[in-house]
Amino acid sequence: MLNKYLLQKLENIDEKLKKLEAALSDPEVLKDQKKLQQVAKEHKETEKLSKLYKEYKKVLKDIEETKSLLNNPDEEMRLLAEEELKNLNQRKEELEKEIQIELLPKDPNDEKNVILEIRQGAGGEEAALFAGELFRMYQRYAERKGWKVEVLSMHPTDRGGIKEVIALIKGQGAYSRLKFESGVHRVQRVPETESSGRIHTSTATVAVLPEAEEVDIEIKPEELKIETMRASGAGGQHVNTTDSAVRITHIPTGIVVSCQDERSQLQNRAKAMQILRARLKDYYDRLEREKIEKERRMQVGTGDRSEKIRTYNFPQNRVTDHRINYTSHRLHDILDGDLDEIIDQLIAKEQEQKLLAISEE
C-alpha cells in the first residue's frame, strides 16, 4: 500500500504536468538549451508517473466493484470475480512498486560524465597487471554503451601493468551505471612468474567521480599551489626537456593532482584542473552525504573506497560481488565488459533500500 507521504506527492501530479507542458512552450525556456533539456526530462518523468497513478486509481476502483460480485448467487460469476480480483490485486502491487521507484529521490549526478581512477593496490606487479585488466574491462563496457573514453593520465609499468590511470568517460547516464564500481577489487590467480602454482591475491582500487563543470565547483586562484617539472617515463627517466608536467595542490583540502601525459604544460594544466574539479566535487558531496546519512546509510557500497566490493577468482572462473552476494561463473565475459547483469542487480538493491527507508518514514 502507498503511504500518506507518497499519496500526497501524487495528488498534485496533474497540476505539475500542466505547468511543465506550459514551460515547454515558454520562449524563455526554448532559447535556453540546457533549461529546455531539463524541463523536457522532468516532463517525461512526470507524464509517466501521471499515467501510472491514473491506472492505479482505476485498479482500486475495479477492485471495489469486483468485491461486490463475490456474494453473487451465481457460482460461475463468483469464481470469475475471484479470479479477476486475484489479477487486480497482483496488478495493484506491481503499480505500487513502479510508482514508488518513480518517486525515489533522483541522484543529481546520474546523467553526468565520469572521471574513472584506477590504482594498483597490494600485490606488486601482479596488482598493476590487474589494474590494467580492470581499465580494459571498463573501456569495453563503455564501447558496448556507445560512450567515449579519454585517458587523462596514465602511469604504466615496464611489464605492461598500470600503476595508476585516470580517464574521462563521456556518455548519457555514465555515472548512474558506473557509480557502484568504487571500492577495492580483488583478484585471485596463479601469476605467470609463480613456478610452484600457488594462488596469489592482489588488489586494485577504483574510484568513480561525477565530472564537475566549472559552475559546480568554485576554485579561487589563491587556493591553488601550481608546480611545474619535467615529465618522466615508466622507469623514472626524464622524457621531456621542458617543464611540461604539472602538479596542482588545493591548499584548503590538501588534494593533489599531477598530470604529465601531454607535451604542453597548458594541456597538462587543463587536464589536472578537470581532475581536481571532479575530486573536489566528490569531496564536498561526501561531506554532505555523511551529514545527511549520519543515522542511516541508503547506498549500496557507493561510498567507502576501502570497502572490498568484488573478487575475481581465475581458478574457479568466478566473480563475486560481496555487497549483494552475487556470484557469476562468467569471469572472462565480465572482464570483457559484460557488466550489465551485475550493475542491474546493484541498482535494484539500492532501490530496495531506498524504498524501505521511504516506507519507514
Swiss-Prot record:
The modification N5-methylglutamine is found at Q237. GO terms for cellular component: cytoplasm. Methylated by PrmC. Methylation increases the termination efficiency of RF1. It is found in: Cytoplasm. Pfam families: PCRF, RF-1. Transmembrane segments: none annotated. InterPro entries: PCRF, Pep_chain_release_fac_I, Pep_chain_release_fac_I_sf, Prokaryotic/Mito_RF, RF-1. One of its GO terms (molecular function) is translation release factor activity, codon specific. Keywords: Cytoplasm, Methylation, Protein biosynthesis. Peptide chain release factor 1 directs the termination of translation in response to the peptide chain termination codons UAG and UAA. PANTHER family: LD18447P. NCBIfam families: prfA, PRK00591.1. Belongs to the prokaryotic/mitochondrial release factor family. This is Peptide chain release factor 1. It comes from Persephonella marina (strain DSM 14350 / EX-H1).
